[in-house]
Amino acid sequence: MEKTDAKDQSSQGDEEKDPPKSHPYSVETPYGFHLDLDFLKYVDDIEKGNTIKRIPIHRRAKQAKFSTLPRNFSLPDSGARPPAAPPLQNWSPVVPREASLGTQEQNQSPPLGNAPQASTSRSEVSYHRKALLAEATRQLEAAEPEDAELTFGSGRPQLLRASSMPATLLHSRASEEPGLSLGPPAPPALPPLQGEGSVCDGTFEPAEGLAGFHSSSPRASTRIPELVQEGAEPPEGVVKVPNHLPLPGPPFSFQNVLVVLEDKEDEHNAREAEVLFTPGSPTPSPPPLPSPIPENELLLEEIELNISEIPPPPPVEVDMRSIGIRVTEESLGLARVDPGSISSLKQQVSALEGELSGRTEELAQVRTALQQQEEEIKAREQRIRELEFTVAQLEGQFHQENAKDTQGQTDVMVNTDPVHGLLTRESCDKGIEVNLLGSMESESWGHRGEENGLLWGPDGHKQGNQSPAERVLLPQLSLPQGPEQVLTSSVHSFLSTELRIEEAGTEQEGGPQGGTRGAGGFLWGSDRKTPPAGREETSSNLPGKEHPGRPPSSPTDATIGQYVKKIQELLQEQWNCLEHGYPELASAIKQPASKLSSIQSQLLSSLNLLLSAYSAQAHPPKEPPASSSSPPVEISPSTSLKSIMKKKDYGFRAGGNGTKKNLQFVGVNGGYETTSSEETSGEDSTPEDLSDSEAEKKCDGPDHKHVKDAHLTCEAGQGIPEGTCHAAQESGPGEEVPHSKAERYKPSEEFLNACRALSQHLPETGTTTDQLLRQSLNTISQEWFRVSSRKSSSPAVVASYLHEVQPHSPHFLKLLVNLADHNGNTALHYSVSHSNFSIVKLLLETGVCNVDHQNKAGYTAVMITPLASAETNEDMAVVWKLLREGNVNIQATQGGQTALMLGVSHDREDMVQALLSCQADVNLQDHDGSSALMVACHHGNVDLVRLLLAHPACDSSLTDKAGRTALSIALKSPTHMEIAGLLRAHAEQGRSLGL
């Protein structure tokens, strides 16, 4: 009985899909074995794993393959074979097996099982397999004539082998196992060949006799030739076996039979199958296939053949692998990164991203808010424009309503006196608006000269052909006398009139240049410095008699008092309307620091003063000086209260020495600049007034420059009787005022009250935040600088203020004398700058004046003394006293100049000599390294150079920061050769004295 194992290939099942309908093909080998070529019937068993058992084979080392040998190469000791002979009849397989070739289908069923048989198409059989089948048939036929020789004379069968089988393989196997043969040497067992086809390993059990080897079926000898002759395609595997098996005489233990199969998948390689005959080999074999003869009933002659078909090796697959090289950070020299730090960094990144998103949202919200604010601002601006337009409309309506209610206007003139000839009147605008109900007829001097003195403004165009004498303001007041004097209906307009109070003036003789008429017929006084020569007279020369047309005692003053009260009522009514109509504006005006609030208070105070003055003059005793200096009133147009106050504040600027220049300490051109003396007066005492004064300078026109310097001083002392102002003005800087008149210059009650309030809190003056104290200090500062720090300031008024303040406290007197404005200038600075040495003397006599006080530019009163003009011996004596009490070597913070340098630069030889006498350092240098001598050389003043070189301490070799000396500066100009000679002589004299 035989057992056959077959292993199917995956590709074989694809090629053979249709089972054969005829009996399978089988091949009988020369050794008597019947090979079944139909392997498909074992596929099911092979797939289930029930029939295959792997046999461990101990293989030797691989031998060299000789792939270049020819396919018909024979084993050694095998001679040429004769043509094919009939196969031996002594070989008969125990179980006949038939091999089916692809295209030939037979109905004979295999003896073992009914497995389906696969057929292959003709196109799928390779040419190489046909050649192998033909070669196997040819070798079997050629081996038949030599069967007898091989059977009895040779112990080695002739085997078919693949082209890669080495020729020395059988010799080596025979030499290794020589003791296994019992008679003649048996053919050695060949090692398995490593091929690429299928390998059939057959293990033959030992036989007790050789009779089984000689019995064979004639079917095997004729089967293969029939297949070749019929042209059938070769099967999938070809079993190459010899047609003889050597039959030695004595019994042998085993025989080796080599069977080589070639797989259909690889046409170029072959595997070898080793068939071993062993007498009782314990080598396990695959489980036998079902057979009609049990294994235990097998005779010795029966040989079991195990055939297993090894599938071809899988195709070579190319694996692509990514090879990574692991390198540690330590080997690269890098710092090891802590995984915790990485996680923390990730957390930080996420936190930052969240914060960024939050900030982005906030930014978007801010942008939205900004857009909303911009829209709100635009809406507010639009609202403000609408309100301004509404205010303008309301003002226009208010003026129109007042114009409709107005039936007439009256120009009021107060305390006028008859004059002989033309008068040049200069006035101070008090800014009082008068709206009088009634009718007046405008009459000129030629019409009713003896009855009234009014000059009606709108009728001025009708009087252009009158004489100059007829255009003079008349001194008599005319009152309404009935409805017959009402003006025509064409003259209905609302005009504001001003009470322009003239403090002093000069008289002009008759002539066309005595006065000028305004566009509306008003008379304007010309500047007191501009009238022609020979026409100027003092007011004391005016006659003191009354006008013939004016009664000695008239009710004019009482009537004016009534009008003043009416003006007060109208102002109060106007304020009430402002509060009700525009409460926000009214609240802003009511602030203590508001300029409008100050103007309102001053206006009311002026009205009170006017009322009290005219009430006191109702029945006064006649005094020629008082009557001569009583302020006549002129009429001037105004458009608003603010413009009136501008005229009031700056109306004095054209008076006095209009062309004389003095200092304003603003740090320009060495710390000072030359401006009009009036610009440095008391209006600069507070920062609030400074901003207004700067704006008012732009509004200053030619109509505002007609008032004298003393007018505003008289206004500052609101409680001073008006008759004394002119007397103070007429007195010169060095003149003494009679004691009886000086007593009449008293500070205002507001000033005295502020002094009392401030004297109780002197330590808190510099740091106080109390609004009342600050207001008191502001009041004192304004009035003090108006009285003491102007070009027109009167020593008598200053003495009166100092006398009134001294009883309060000596400390308060020191505070008042050294009070500084926002530029750091004191009354002493201003008095020296204006050359008011009488006031300087008064300030020095107090004993509390700080002479070395520096302003913001770093200048003291001593430093600016060389710039003043001391015209008299008394003035020069004050200068010497000032220089002795102060430090003459103080340098300014701006530029480092000294008093001596300022005197030299302004060519003040007398002041330079006084400074040198008061121990002034002649060698001090400014920030540029220049000395007083260098400045004198630069200006080319030979006398000053000679005076400086005469000083024993003078050093002519000093150099400035540019490396220049006084001599090099003098040599730059060809006109300074005399100075260069003086410098050379001084240098030679110094060298000679040094030797």
Swiss-Prot record:
Gene3D superfamilies: Ankyrin repeat-containing domain. Strongly expressed in colon, liver, lung, skeletal muscle and kidney. It is found in: Cytoplasm. The keyword Repeat applies. Residues 1-29, 68-127, 443-467, 503-558, 617-642, 663-705, 721-740 are annotated as: Disordered. One of its GO terms (biological process) is negative regulation of actin filament polymerization. The keyword Coiled coil applies. Residues 101-124 have a biased composition (Polar residues). Pfam families: Ank_2, KN_motif. GO terms for cellular component: cytoplasm; cytoskeleton; cytosol; microtubule cytoskeleton. Keywords: ANK repeat, Coiled coil, Cytoplasm, Repeat. Residues 511-523 have a biased composition (Gly residues). Residues 680-693 have a biased composition (Acidic residues). Residues 343-404 form a coiled coil. Residues 526-549, 694-705 have a biased composition (Basic and acidic residues). ANK repeats lie at residues 823-853, 862-890, 895-924, 928-958, 962-992. Residues 625-640 have a biased composition (Low complexity). InterPro entries: Ankyrin_rpt, Ankyrin_rpt-contain_sf, KANK1-4, KN_motif. Its main location: cytoplasm. May be involved in the control of cytoskeleton formation by regulating actin polymerization. This is KN motif and ankyrin repeat domain-containing protein 4. The gene is KANK4.
